[in-house]
Amino acid sequence: MHNLPTKATYVNTQGETIYLSHAGFTPRATEDGDLRWVWDEDLIWSRDHFLDAWPEDEMFKKAIVVHGHTPVPYLLEDIDPACRMGEVEPGALWYCDGHKVCVDAGAVFTGYCSLLNLDTWDEEVFSTEPYLT
């Protein structure tokens, strides 16, 4: 596990820049106009970015952060405290004006897992029940 990368960047077939990390983050630009990554530990564990506003820098206009770490039902409770776990449809959650997507369906709690095609944004949600026996 220690040798795995903590982040990756992918440009999809639509020309969108996708930043992937376990916990997600809000991108920021350096003074030179490059991406300023956050600390590796934050890319793995942080939940502090959920309510951040998306940066207005031109380089992030066609950028999307894809992450997991926090199951969608719990993330929704951070964004809207009126949401409750049992009321959430299984699948990915798009937020931050469509620039962030959490793909953690919370399989251990909900029994669902989601996959997201980074080129088409098609989502596949499936039940983990058949695999838990």
Segment roles from a protein language model:
Residues 1-101, 106-111:
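Acidic, His/Gly-enriched loop-helix segments that form or flank divalent-metal centers
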